[in-house]
Design a protein with these regions (language model features):
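Long, hydrophobic, well-ordered secondary-structure blocks that form the structural core
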Residues: 113-192
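Amphipathic, well-ordered alpha-helical segments in soluble domains
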Residues: 129-136, 163, 225-229, 259-262, ...
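Alpha-helical scaffold segments in carbohydrate-active enzymes
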Residues: 155-173, 251-266, 290, 294
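Alpha-helical scaffold segments that form or flank carboxylate-/histidine-based iron centers
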Residues: 34-39, 118-122, 145-161, 241-258, ...
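Acidic/His metal-coordination segments adjacent to aromatic residues that form catalytic metal sites
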Residues: 101-122, 180-218, 277, 281, ...
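Inter-helical turn/loop segments and adjacent helix faces that build the functional surface
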Residues: 138-152, 172-179, 205-212, 231-251, ...
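Alpha-helical bundle segments that constitute or directly flank the non-heme di-iron/ferroxidase center
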Residues: 47, 113-144, 207-236
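Terminal targeting/low-complexity segments that flank the catalytic cores of oxidoreductases
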Residues: 1-129, 273-335
Length: 335
C-alpha cells in the first residue's frame, strides 16, 4: 500500500473582522488592532448618568481635548493584555533580581545618612503619589473616548500600582523586613511641608472632571519628579557612594521612558488632528503651560529638601530646567 502526501492550502474565510476591514482594508490585522479598534460604546444607552444628565454615560465631551476619529491614535507599544503582562512581568522580575543583590550585599545599610534620609523622607512617601496616579488614570480609562486611548490609560493605571509596590519593597528591605518605614512614610506624606504641595496637587487632580486636563497635570509632575529622582539623582548616586539607590532608580527610569511613549503619541495625535488639531494645540499650550507652572511650584520645596539633605543646590536647578523644556514642548516657545 502506498500513501501520497499532498500539501493543501486552506484559505481563511475572512482576513479580519468586518469593521476592521472597512477601516484598513480586507487584510490580516494584528491582535492589538482587532482588540482595540471601534470598541467604544456609542449607542443603545439606557439612561443618562444622574450625576450629569447633560451627557451620556459614554460621551466624547468629558474632555476639552477631542479627536475627529479617536482611532487615529494608536499606542506605539501595541499593548493588549498578553504583551502588556509579558512586558511587566519581565520588568518586575528584573527589579526583584536587583533587590536581591542589594540585600545580599547589604547595600541599603551602607547608604550615607543623607541618601538614606532622601529615601525615607521623600522617595518612599511617593508610593502615595503613585496611588493617586492610579486613580487619575482610572478616571481617564473610564471617561476617555476611544478604545485605544482608554486602554493605554488603563494599563498605565495598573503600572502605578506596580510602581507603588516597587517603592514599598524598597521600604520593607530598608526597614529590615518590616513595614515600619512605610508607616513613617505615610506620616511624612501627610505632615511634612516639602510634600504638601505634591499631596494637594494629587488630591485636586483626582477629582478633576476633565480627564485630559488631569492627564496633563499628572504628566507635568511626573516629568519633574521622575527626571529628578531617577535620572539626576541616579547620576549623583553613582559618584556619591549610594549604589543601592542607583540600582533601584534604573527600573523606575526605564518604566517612565516606556510610559512616555503612549502619552507623547497622544499629544501628537491631538495636535495633528485634521479638523481639531489647531484647537487642541491651543489648549495644550494653555493648559500644558499652566500644569507645568503648578508642577514646578509644588515640586520646588521637595527638590529644596533634597538639596538640604545632600548638601547642594542642583536639585532645584534641575527641575527648573526640566520645567522650561516641558513648557516649551507644550507651547512651542521658550519660557
Amino acid at each position: 500500500m502506498q500513501y501520497e502526501l499532498k500539501t493543501q492550502v486552506i484559505e481563511p474565510q475572512r482576513q479580519t473582522f468586518t469593521h476592521i476591514a472597512k477601516r484598513y482594508g480586507d487584510k490580516p490585522a494584528s491582535r492589538y488592532t482587532e482588540g482595540s479598534i471601534d470598541v467604544q460604546p456609542k449607542e443603545h444607552f439606557q439612561y443618562r448618568p444622574t450625576w450629569d444628565p447633560t451627557r451620556e454615560i459614554f460621551d466624547d465631551s468629558y474632555s476639552v481635548f477631542r479627536l475627529t476619529d479617536p482611532y487615529s491614535y494608536l499606542d506605539p507599544r501595541q499593548y493588549y493584555y498578553a504583551p502588556y503582562v509579558t512586558a511587566r512581568s519581565g520588568h518586575h522580575e528584573a527589579f526583584a533580581t536587583s533587590l536581591e543583590y542589594i540585600e545580599a550585599r547589604g547595600l541599603l545599610e551602607r547608604l550615607p545618612d543623607g541618601w538614606r534620609s532622601v529615601l525615607t523622607e521623600l522617595v518612599l512617601p511617593l508610593r502615595h503619589l503613585e496611588s493617586a496616579g492610579q486613580l487619575i488614570l482610572c478616571g481617564m480609562a473610564r471617561f476617555g473616548w476611544g478604545g485605544t486611548v482608554t486602554q493605554a490609560a488603563a494599563y498605565s493605571a495598573f503600572d502605578r500600582v506596580g510602581n507603588a509596590q516597587v517603592l514599598s519593597r524598597v521600604g520593607i528591605a530598608l526597614g529590615g523586613g518590616t513595614a515600619d518605614l512605610l508607616a513613617e512614610a505615610k506620616e511624612h506624606w501627610l505632615q511634612d511641608a516639602p510634600l504638601q504641595g505634591l499631596r494637594r496637587m494629587a488630591e485636586e487632580t483626582i477629582v478633576e472632571t476633565d480627564w485630559g486636563l488631569a492627564l496633563l497635570r499628572l504628566d507635568a509632575v511626573d516629568r519633574l519628579v521622575y527626571d529628578l529622582l531617577y535620572q539626576h539623582l541616579d547620576d549623583q548616586a553613582v559618584v556619591s557612594g549610594a549604589p543601592a539607590y542607583s540600582l533601584v532608580a534604573q527600573h523606575m527610569a526605564s518604566w517612565f521612558a516606556d510610559n512616555r511613549r503612549w502619552i507623547d503619541a497622544l499629544y501628537t495625535a491631538w495636535r495633528e488632528d485634521p479638523e481639531l488639531g489647531a484647537t487642541n494645540a491651543a489648549l495644550l499650550a494653555e493648559h500644558g503651560a499652566a500644569a507645568v507652572d503648578t508642577a514646578l511650584e509644588v515640586v520646588t520645596p521637595f527638590a529644596a529638601r533634597i538639596d538640604e539633605l545632600l548638601g547642594g543646590s542642583s536639585a532645584v536647578d534641575r527641575i527648573t530646567m526640566t520645567a522650561a523644556e516641558v513648557r516649551t514642548a507644550h507651547t512651542g516657545a521658550a519660557a
